[in-house]
Amino acid sequence: SEMCIRDRYKSRYWDGKIRLFNTQTGQIYVGLLDRVVQFCKDHEYTYEFKESEFYGLPFEVNEFISKEGVKDYMHSICKHSPREYQIEGVYDALRHNRKLLISPTASGKSLMIYSIVRYYVEKKQSILIVVPTTSLVEQMYKDFADYGWDVGSYCHKIYAGKERETDSQVIITTWQSIYKLPRKYFDRFSVVIGDEAHQFKSKSLVSIMGKLGDAKYRFGFTGTLSGSQTHKWVLEGLFGPSYKIIKTNELMKKGHVASLDINVLLLKHPPTRFETFEDEVQYIIT
């Protein structure tokens, strides 16, 4: 829990830092592999990859995934027409197995998540979708239904008071509801999707992702990495390299979101001291 983490910090059992490289095991998150490779190139080190029985090679690319195929698939599973950048995002995710997709508010992240979920459901994979709040659990479930899916037959919601044990292929949950659960609970999941990943607490996210040992397919979605409660490199390490799908100003130009005008009111006044906060407020507004 958050209090337990704080106690460990105060008692000096933990210095408050998340370490991406484990000096004891010599392991680093595979999502940071591109940075390791760049480090080797910069320092003229040689390197080689050894194939894993389960994961294959870390730079595995699914060549059979085509952009046209993804486009046709997204049109076939949804009554809403996907936008070009949404197709691009889903294509990039399915092609590389691991991605941190950065897409701003109102860009339609739920449609991209829905498309990825539908693809892996058809592949008979079990999927864990993790979100930061109970309202987002309900919103995601509702969005899937709005897209025309028989969501009740495939999805199960978990948050305070909800049953955690289920045979449903897709689980939508808050991270708070599952991060204390034992590793055995996570064994059946081969796909994990984190929405609004920047809102997760680092230690809790690391705990969840660390228990998902058999989850080969990992996708994080976030609107921004600025002001994140979790460092960008932690998110990339856990999910994969970041990929910016589209910017807010591009959405405005295309008419997908309302245009924004910002008027800055700059008040110039000499420095003045006040006896109370209320006096200062009255001075500012009069």
Describe each PLM feature range.
Residues 111-115, 119-146:
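Conserved Walker A/P-loop ATP-binding site and its immediately adjacent core
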Residues 7-60:
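Interdomain "pre-motor" coupling segment immediately N-terminal to P-loop NTPase/helicase cores
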Residues 160-191, 202-207:
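Conserved helix/coil segment N-terminal to the catalytic DExD/H
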Residues 3-5:
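Short, small-residue-biased leader/transition segments that mark boundaries at the very start
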Residues 198-261:
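Post-DEXD/H (motif II) to motif III coupling segment of the RecA-like Helicase ATP-binding lobe
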Residues 96-118:
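Walker A/P-loop
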Residues 55-102:
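Conserved pre-motif I regulatory segment
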Residues 246-286:
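Conserved interdomain linker/interface between the two RecA-like ATPase lobes of SF2 helicase motors
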